[in-house]
From Swiss-Prot:
It holds the Pfam family CTP_transf_like. Keywords: ATP-binding, Cytoplasm, NAD, Nucleotide-binding, Nucleotidyltransferase, Pyridine nucleotide biosynthesis, Transferase. It catalyses: beta-nicotinamide D-ribonucleotide + ATP + H(+) = diphosphate + NAD(+). This is Nicotinamide-nucleotide adenylyltransferase. NCBIfam families: arch_NMN_Atrans (TIGR01527), cyt_tran_rel (TIGR00125), PRK01153.1 (NF002243). It comes from Methanococcus vannielii (strain ATCC 35089 / DSM 1224 / JCM 13029 / OCM 148 / SB). Pathway: Cofactor biosynthesis; NAD(+) biosynthesis; NAD(+) from nicotinamide D-ribonucleotide: step 1/1. GO terms for cellular component: cytoplasm. It is found in: Cytoplasm. One of its GO terms (molecular function) is nicotinamide-nucleotide adenylyltransferase activity. Its main location: cytoplasm. Its EC number is 2.7.7.1. InterPro entries: Cyt_trans-like, NMN_Atrans_arc, Rossmann-like_a/b/a_fold.
Length: 172
């Protein structure tokens, strides 16, 4: 059996890792969708699709998990989004999501949709991790060490801080 899960993975953290590991116990292969793959260089989505692929690939390298990583664009046309996903991915039977819109769209196309059990959601939140990065607080223990390495390699902290700078135009 093959399953699909989509996320923004901004950044890929230990909560995400635990969900992927749990799903891998239930299916033979996982298709990991890089959602909003066209978005990057914002405070909400600071990392590129390629950087997120590096994070996930390196973090999963030590586990015996069969997976594909597929970039998924936002198309702002919800009625056909599932068809777009299907055209980009290998076939799959089951969708794992905690997102109500994704659940609805795949349910309407008769997919089996499961809600993954979130792993310590209060502690493992991409939003909170990005806030900690911005404030100069400790964030490294929330992500796999391989993700720390990628973020340091690409100067992800510097990028987030530069994105938060107020432009001169903002004052007028």
């Amino acid at each position: 059996m093959r399953a699909f899960i989509v996320g923004r993975w901004q950044p890929f953290h230990k909560g995400h890792l635990e969900i992927i590991k749990k799903i891998s116990e239930e299916v033979d292969e996982i298709i990991i969708g890089i959602g909003s793959c066209q978005r990057s260089h914002t405070l909400t989505d600071p990392f590129t699709a390629g950087e997120r692929i590096m994070m996930i690939t390196k973090a999963l390298g030590r586990y015996n998990i069969n997976y594909y990583i597929i970039p998924i664009n936002d198309i702002d046309f919800n009625a056909v989004w599932v068809s777009c996903v299907e055209s980009l991915t290998p076939p799959f039977d089951t969708v794992y999501t905690g997102n109500s819109l994704v659940r609805e769209l795949f349910s309407e196309k008769n997919y089996v949709v499961k809600k993954p059990e979130l792993y310590n959601r209060k502690e493992y939140s991409g939003t909170e991790i990005r806030k900690k990065m911005l404030k100069g607080e400790k964030w490294e223990h929330f992500v796999p060490e391989e993700v720390v390495d990628v973020i340091l390699e690409i100067d992800g902290i510097g990028r987030i801080k530069r994105l938060d700078e107020k432009d001169y135009d903002d004052y007028f």
